[in-house]
Structure formats: C-alpha cells, structure tokens
C-alpha cells in the first residue's frame, strides 16, 4: 500500500493504462477487460485490474496535470513494480492537419512546466520522449485495425487556461496538440528505466473551437483505448 493507492502487492499488473478521469478508468475496465476487480478508491482515483486477451492489465485514474500524474506514476513504479505506463486521455488539437476525434500518439512532449529545470537545473533542457518499442507497437496496432493516427510532438502545459503561449509558433514547429501530463510521465519513466507512452484523442481544437461533449469524452474514444491496450500486451 502506498500513500495514494490502497492496493496490495500483486493487485496491479505490470502494464497500466492511465486515464486522467476516474469515470473513464471505470468505463475502460468495464468495457474492455474481463474478470475485473477494483483495487483503489482513495480520493476516488479508481484503479482496476482485469484481463485483455488473456493478459493482466490495470487501469489507474491519474487526475489532471503534471503534479497529479507524477504522484501516481511514482507510486506505481516504486511501490508496485509497474513496467509499462500508457496514458490514455484527451488533447487539444493544433494546426489544420489535425481534427477533433483524431487519435494521436505522442512521440515527444515539450513542456512549459518547471519540472525540467527543477530536475536538471538551469541551462539543461531535457527532451521527454516516448518509449520507442511501445510507440511502434501502438502505431502497428492502429494500422492493423485501420485506425488513422497522427504521430509527433505535443505540448504538456501547466495551465489549462493559458493565453500567453504563442500557438501559431507551436503550429509552425509541428506541435500537434496540447495536454497536461505526458512530459512528466516520460521523464519519470526514463528516470526509473520503464516504458511510457501517451495515446490521445483530440477532444477539442484549440484554434477552430470545435469540441466534443463531456459524456463523449468519458464514454467513447474507443479507438484510442484499443490502440493503447494492443500496445500494452506482449
């Protein structure tokens, strides 16, 4: 048992999907997994373990933002021996070549968070990147399922409401979308020598204003979940 997760040793699989929303965690477990049991209710950050195609998979809600996902990633890795962490969540789209409901695989995650400087000190700008093997498995799974995906750099922001960032410059430099967690997940995975990936769905377009409903964000986006699950099994 850790500070924020009440599971016992052996309750959590080596592969964990990390949705931010606890209701999305519940939806994933009930819709995609078999023989499911819930191992965590602390702070209503629901955690479940079940089976997908015969292999144990866990789903742990991780909250919103870098501080929250950092807590769960640290505890899953250090207390429960998790080896593969796959964030599944939403992302705001940027540019004209990405659209609402597109699936996106984050190859790398730039950030405006101070987590990089706090870790490495001033003057060193570490580049958080996904695990290549997980990324390739996710991309190949999407191709086999005929799911169109975008692969590229995203931005992990510290603020959801942020008017100061130059969005057009991000688009110019090929940043596909914006969310709030992946950079920390990738950095922590590198620190502890485990695998991490973010598979995202564009829930809204930051430039055009198009968006999906809260219910759709909670209970759909099944293509993203399928890609993540396929990447997570051996």
Curated annotation (Swiss-Prot):
GO-annotated cellular components: cytosol
EC number annotated for this UniProt entry: 2.4.2.1
Annotated binding of a purine D-ribonucleoside, by residue: 4, 179-181, 203-204
Residues where phosphate binds: 20, 24, 43, 87-90
An annotated GO BP: purine nucleoside catabolic process
Reaction(s) this enzyme catalyzes, per UniProt: a purine D-ribonucleoside + phosphate = a purine nucleobase + alpha-D-ribose 1-phosphate; a purine 2'-deoxy-D-ribonucleoside + phosphate = a purine nucleobase + 2-deoxy-alpha-D-ribose 1-phosphate
Protein task: Catalyzes the reversible phosphorolytic breakdown of the N-glycosidic bond in the beta-(deoxy)ribonucleoside molecules, with the formation of the corresponding free purine bases and pentose-1-phosphate.
NCBIfam families associated with the record: deoD (TIGR00107), PRK05819.1 (NF004489)
UniProt GO MF annotations: purine-nucleoside phosphorylase activity
Lineage, broadest ranks: Bacteria, Bacillati, Bacillota, Bacilli, Lactobacillales
Protein name in the entry: Purine nucleoside phosphorylase DeoD-type
